[in-house]
Amino acid sequence: MTENPVCRRLVGRTAVVTGAGSGIGLATARRLAAEGAHIVCADIDEAAGKAAAEETRGLFVKTDVTDPEQVEALFQAAFDTYGSVDIAFNNAGISPPDDDSILDTGLEAWKRVQEVNLTSVYLCCKAAIPYMRRQGKGSIINTASFVARMGAATSQISYTASKGGVLAMSRELGVQFAREGIRVNALCPGPVNTPLLRELFAKDPERAARRLVHIPLGRFAEANEIAAAVAFLASDDSSFVNATDFLVDGGISGAYVTPL
């Protein structure tokens, strides 16, 4: 997978990317732009979002993805600027340190993670689908996680539950709207070498080591590798891929024992 793809599968299409200011979102904005898409960068961090939009020659819309009115305005801005909403990569999310074992995680921490990781995906799908229905075509990619498929001994209870919700919602929407030309898939990355992961594991190196040893490929993913998967799901190359949990996890979910 390359950061500078020669294929241009998305020429003329409009892609809305939430959490576009950093990590997977930024890498995906770059990749989709390289493949010819118009990019609408959404982020609550104005400086990071503007930088992403400038780099990808796209549009920045400052967005709190937990606010229904701001989410509606985001997709309206995409349509007003470029004339269509073809791709929605609903990716914004958090993984705060106070989300831990169920025994230690407070209700406010639980609610905050659910709002950002799950409710935001609901709001973004709800806003994007009407545009895609009118067009008769569209691809929605929602960021879930490999932990939506597997239990984790190093628990982040609200994060895991939120990503399980994203997985189930994506499956249902993919089935519901398939005959209207809309595909909905859940992207399930393994641990990715992003600022979010580095911040989390810097505070707990032992936790990082425990994660790393279980990855058959022996390393964390790079954000551009996840972006390549998003580009595939956004493109017509995945025209028969729908309502799936699309795993990009380096083999974690397929490993019965830890590789030597």
Region locations from a protein language model:
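Short C-terminal tail/terminal secondary-structure segment
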Residues: 2-7, 99, 231, 242-260
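The beta1-alpha1 cofactor-binding region of Rossmann-like NAD(H)/NADP(H)-dependent oxidoreductases
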Residues: 46-47, 63-74, 107, 224-225
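Substrate-binding pocket helix/loop in short-chain dehydrogenase/reductase
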Residues: 99-102, 106-111, 211
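Active-site helix of classical SDR
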Residues: 125, 162, 170
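Alpha-helical segment proximal to the catalytic Tyr-Lys
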Residues: 130, 175-179, 239
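Residue(s) in the substrate-gating loop at a strand-loop-helix junction
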Residues: 145
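C-terminal substrate-recognition "lid" of short-chain dehydrogenase/reductases
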Residues: 182-183, 219-248, 253
